[in-house]
Amino acid sequence: MRTDDFDYKLPEELIASYPLENRDASRLLKLNKQTGEILDHKFTDFIDFINPEDLLIFNNSKVMLARLYGEKITGAKLEYLIERVKTPKIFETHIKANRSPAIGSEIYVQDTLAKILEKDGGMYLLELQGNKDIYQLMEEFGHIPLPPYMKRDDEEFDAERYQTVYAKDLGSVAAPTAGLHFSEELMQQIKAKGTDIAYITLHVGSGTFKPVQVDDVNNHKMHSEVISVSEDVCEKIRQTKANGGRVIAIGTTSVRSLETAGQSGEIQPYQGETDIFLYPGKKFNIVDAMITNFHLPKSTLIMLVSAFADKEKIMKAYEHAIAEKYRFFSYGDAMFIF
């Protein structure tokens, strides 16, 4: 299977660089994965597509203010993208610099000195030397790390709009974007309908934006992310399945978490790393339907939805979305695949 099979041409004006005024004002393309039928809806119509016996699974990870700035002792400018916090003083980060800083050297992260402990590929391990920890630095100086395709600096509203309304556990470098469409009001409507809700956690890494760089999909090495699926969530899933309801994953991060926890065929609690790569030919054991945004060409995420719904049906849905001028990517519109 070729990576080029998952390419498509997207007019640049369809990339959503800004969110709509209201979260739930986006559009929703409804795709029947059995028949291939495509229907155009408003996102608020989603309430009509779910039943009381269904279970919605959301990713409650919160985006870190992960973009920071600093300099070398020489004064040369540095830009950081914090990838993962190991302890309050030790963290993994990408560093953008004219010349890569050396292992063992000291550099400034904002106003605080840090030592470079290790380097692995493009990832550095830093230890802060001052009184402040990385959480304090992010809180004081940090910027929302908008995806590169938005081609703009973050603005004040992004701190709210690039987070889901239910975000709780700090740790992501990118938003679990399918959840951005859910307003407080829509969450209340779901509860009022009697549809149950559960939360998993997957801390999204910057690898989510990385295009697949090998020609053969089978040779792609997936990046690793930290997930948590509790026994309470597993029990809700078992009950939902037993009662004939559907497990509806909100976003590909929820899909990957649930399918990691369900790799044996049965859902089990899971805490740790996942590098699960779902592409056509892979089986889904847990998820029955999903909400997801429109994904970048040749990305692992367009491969995931193609595995779930059949590649030809997905590509036809994307063609339809482009023709109908849907908005694409993180701040864009969504699909309901069932």
UniProtKB/Swiss-Prot annotation:
One Gene Ontology MF term: S-adenosylmethionine:tRNA ribosyltransferase-isomerase activity
Subcellular location: Cytoplasm
Keyword Cytoplasm: yes
Catalytic reactions on record: 7-aminomethyl-7-carbaguanosine(34) in tRNA + S-adenosyl-L-methionine = epoxyqueuosine(34) in tRNA + adenine + L-methionine + 2 H(+)
Main location: cytoplasm
EC numbers on record: 2.4.99.17
Record key words, sorted: Cytoplasm, Queuosine biosynthesis, S-adenosyl-L-methionine, Transferase
Signal sequence, start to end: none
Recorded superkingdom: Bacteria
Pathway, per record: tRNA modification; tRNA-queuosine biosynthesis
Listed InterPro entries: QueA (IPR003699), QueA_dom1 (IPR042118), QueA_dom2 (IPR042119), QueA_sf (IPR036100)
One of the GO biological process terms: tRNA wobble guanine modification
Record carries keyword Transferase: yes
Gene Ontology, cellular component aspect: cytoplasm
Subunit structure: Monomer.
Functional summary from the UniProt entry: Transfers and isomerizes the ribose moiety from AdoMet to the 7-aminomethyl group of 7-deazaguanine (preQ1-tRNA) to give epoxyqueuosine (oQ-tRNA).
Family under the similarity heading: Belongs to the QueA family.
Name used for this protein in its record: S-adenosylmethionine:tRNA ribosyltransferase-isomerase
Protein's organism: Francisella philomiragia subsp. philomiragia (strain ATCC 25017 / CCUG 19701 / FSC 153 / O#319-036)
Gene name of the record: queA
